[in-house]
Amino acid sequence: MDKLQRDGKEDTPRQRRFLYPLLFQEDLYAIAYDHYFNRSSSFEPMENSSSNDRFSFLTVKRLISRIRQQNGSIVPFVNCDQTQLVGHNRSFYSELVLGGLTAVPEVPFSIRSKHSLERMNEWTSFRSIHSIFPLMEDKIPHSNFILDIRIPHLTHPEILVRTFRRWIQDAPSLHSLRSVLHEHRNLIISSNLDQLILIASKENTRLSLFLWNYYAYECESLLVPLWKRFSYSRSLPYESFIERTPFYRKIEHIVIFYHKYLKKSLWFLKDPSIHYVKHRERSIIALRGTYLLAKKWRYHITNFWQCHFHLWPQPYRIYIDELSNNWFSFLGYLLSVKMKTSVVRIKMLDDSFITDLITKKFDPIAPTTLLIGSLAKEKFCDISGHPISRLAWTGLTDDDILDRFDQIWRNIFHYHSGSSKKDGLYRIKYILRLPCAKTLACKHKSAIRVVRERFGSELFTKSSPKERESIFLSFSKTRSQRERIWHSDIIQRNPLINSCRKKHN
């Protein structure tokens, strides 16, 4: 694969035209087999695997020879009868073929993405989810409106085939990809990435994720260059005539672009305060201006996607929120901009007067109601917050029970440490403390009062006092209760559900 990427980097047009012969390379299916085996071994023990799942390169050679003699696409192999596979599992070889079809377009796509990142040296990418919030904390208070964008639905496989056709000129590869997409429509037709992964896990998660990432990349590739040109454009210098100043001020805030897909010029009001962040299927655009300007941006984005993908993206999937009056939910936080008024005394020579200074402040809050709903979903409490004991954990030792509740609380507090208000987090801690006490009481067949007398009122936070002291004393002594901390090691969006699933409850 490295050699293919080096060859493609030297002669990209030639490499785009001859992708189909890669499907007849045995090494490609070896790569697909390794991926299939590694993914399967993590879910299924080796002794439980079927003998039909044993890979045979001799069978692959025979099937490749049979395909070459048919002068057809890969579909007869995918849909062939199980008896034609010399006694081997049909779904297993179908998985390998899908893996091969995934590896083929990944080669030019990875080269294209790498070149795009090399050209954008001023763009920085971080793995941590919390790296988004310092940017928003610095930039969003200077904005007036938020465009909350959901990526449009993919309703037909031909939309992806048309986008692939723009940069892959190998017709047999496109026909093979078209046949697979029509055969496995569940790989792409979904409006939610989590739902897409759940559906595709029964078929081929790698192919579905590649198609989703490619589709999201295409959605952004049309808009990001325009935003960059729009943000980095500079006004022409003009002479400062008093009577002509309003006229020149109007001219300098207008930028004209010609778009090759729309075949016409686009007029925008220039404003350098445009910021863009994206996570999974959601994108956030923060801009400074009027409500009319936000509606124009929504109109242009809708037209861009309609002309580029030949589909109708619903305008209601682009929400407009005014930061001064509303909050919006993003990455597990409720985000808003608060107006802070300060009384300032200004002294000028022999005179002084008092005035109000209004500043904008980024205000992220942990959603207590949503966190209680997540606890209720994992059976720690009901929807109103009343505790429920974990009967499945009563067979564990006391230390294991305390450690599990302690780890869940630490993950929640670690992720939402950027919240400006910690009261909701301490309420979550109180709710978790009661299920912990009830679980220990059920195990020892005693009352909750006896458990609290034995383990103390803090219960699970007593299991590691040093780390608890380092966390809470930092807030009580050296830092304010409203100070925010963003961590660079957080890569998961919902630490509660992930930590619960790791415990195999």
Swiss-Prot record:
GO CC terms, sorted: chloroplast
InterPro entries named among the record's database cross-references: Domain_X, Maturase_MatK, Maturase_MatK_N
One term of GO molecular function: RNA binding
UniProt-annotated location(s): Plastid, Chloroplast
Species of provenance: Dioon edule (Virgin's palm)
PANTHER family, sorted: MATURASE K (PTHR34811:SF1)
Family membership: Belongs to the intron maturase 2 family. MatK subfamily.
Signal peptide start and end residues: none
Iron is among the record's keywords: no
Protein name: Maturase K
Alphabetical UniProt keywords: Chloroplast, mRNA processing, Plastid, RNA-binding, tRNA processing
Matching HAMAP family: MatK (MF_01390)
Matches recorded under Pfam families: Intron_maturas2, MatK_N
Ranges in a coiled coil: none
Main location: plastid
Gene Ontology biological-process annotations: mRNA processing; RNA splicing; tRNA processing
Keyword Transmembrane helix annotated: no
Free-text function comment from the UniProt entry: Usually encoded in the trnK tRNA gene intron. Probably assists in splicing its own and other chloroplast group II introns.
